[in-house]
Regions:
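Active-site segments that bind and position negatively charged phosphate/pyrophosphate groups
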Residues: 196, 200-310
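A glycine/threonine-rich phosphate-anchoring loop and its flanking beta-alpha core
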Residues: 7, 16, 20, 111, ...
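Glycine-rich beta-strand-to-loop/alpha-helix junction loops that act as flexible
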Residues: 69-70, 100-102, 243-244
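Residue-level signal for inorganic ion chemistry
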Residues: 18, 39, 75, 126, ...
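ATP/NTP phosphate-donor binding region
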Residues: 1-96
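Short glycine/serine/threonine-rich phosphate/pyrophosphate-binding segments
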Residues: 104-111, 132, 249-250
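Hydrophobic/aromatic beta-strand patches that form the interior of the parallel beta-sheet core
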Residues: 63-65, 98, 123-125, 160-163, ...
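C-terminal charged capping/lid subdomain of soluble metabolic enzymes
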Residues: 2, 12, 181-183, 282-355
Length: 355
């Protein structure tokens, strides 16, 4: 089992990565024996997983709240229902939420924990590749509103993150590829080792080789934990974690979160951002080709031709990275490292959508 850490001071937390079943001792170490526990999960998580988790937690008062699978479930209505459940169960500040599912579950369960009684503890047990490498680490919690994705939320670190590759065996191909989109993101942000791992093991990755999966999850989390520990509230360097997200979120919002998975949308967003980087002179043509080829090598779609700038503009301009009326973009440089800038030619954005 690999143990990593993220956060600072009292909000520092452990991240455990295993290719075996969940370590029972680690889980129960962080749950007070007398505490009530609410497992928030979704309809996509196999019932056997939920049953096994409930049996693993030694507490006598363990409850389950299930939401529907999918991004649309990250709604204000579902958030209210979780709060009502906590109130009905008479939860106190010593009680705990366990987020057991994908990124949607982690976001809404974490946001519920951050706001109920001004904050109760929660544990992340992500069951999708996307949530394992991305949303479970960093303390971002949120719900969606009609005007955009993640516009209502809080930074609130979990007490513990437990990651097992065992859960990835039953993941659909669509969900698996969604997670690979975020893995690719870390390879381009600032992790040459991860980039080399993907280049040399693309076939094993598509075949879900357990050892390679553990390695790419570990490298992805190392990259993210290093960045979020330096910048817990996204006031500086953490913004580079949004590489591809400005355009990916716009695609998701435009299609009402129905057409593409989150990772698939972010993948297209990275292709668009890379093309803008090329037009702005930050990377060479062969580097743009390398980026697109690496993405395609693990079976991810790079064709964004069905999405027009004119259709996405209003969503792009609703982006959280707008400061002082200026849109900040995350681009990539010739060293394959992401950086934030508000200095770019708008025509290069339009051009990137056309090629």
């Amino acid at each position: 089992m690999v143990e990593l850490y993220a956060g600072k001071g009292p909000s520092r937390y452990k991240i455990c990565i295993t290719d075996n079943v969940l370590p029972k001792n680690q889980l129960n170490k962080y749950i007070d024996r007398k505490a009530k526990v609410l497992i928030v999960t979704d309809s996509g998580v196999p019932k056997t997983y939920i049953k096994n988790l409930k049996q693993t937690i030694r507490n006598s008062s363990v409850h389950i709240h299930e939401i529907k699978n999918g991004e649309k479930a990250k709604s204000f209505k579902n958030y209210q229902q979780i709060l009502k459940k906590l109130i009905d169960l008479k939860f106190s500040r010593t009680d705990l939420i366990v987020a057991f599912g994908g990124g949607v579950v982690g976001d809404i369960a974490g946001f519920s924990a951050s706001t109920f009684l001004r904050g109760i503890g929660y544990i992340q047990i992500p069951t999708t590749l996307l949530s394992q490498v991305d949303s479970s680490v960093g303390g971002k919690t949120a719900i969606n509103v009609p005007e955009g994705k993640n516009l209502v939320g809080a930074f609130y670190n979990p007490k513990l993150v437990l990651i097992s590759t065992v859960y990835l065996k039953t993941l659909s191909e669509k969900e698996y590829k969604s997670g690979l989109g975020e893995v690719i993101k870390y390879a381009f942000i600032d992790n040459k080792k991860l980039r080399n791992l993907i280049e040399k093991n693309s076939q094993k990755i598509t075949q879900r080789d357990n050892k390679i999966l553990k390695d790419i999850i570990e490298e992805s989390i190392k990259t993210k934990s290093k960045i979020v520990t330096k910048d817990e509230k996204e006031s500086g360097i953490r913004a580079i974690l949004n590489f591809g997200h400005t355009f990916g979120h716009a695609i998701e919002a435009r299609t009402r979160y129905k057409k593409l998975s989150h990772g698939a949308a972010i993948t297209l967003g990275m292709v668009i951002a890379s093309k803008i980087s090329f037009f702005e002179g930050h990377i060479k043509d062969y580097q743009l080709e390398n980026i697109i080829n690496l993405i395609a090598s693990i079976g991810l779609d790079t064709d964004h031709s069905s999405y027009k700038y004119s259709e996405l503009k209003k969503y792009i301009m609703n982006d959280k990275k707008i400061a002082d009326g200026k849109l900040n973009l995350i681009m990539i440089n010739e060293n394959y490292k992401a950086f934030k800038t508000d200095k770019f030619d708008l025509n290069n954005i339009k051009k990137a959508f056309k090629v």
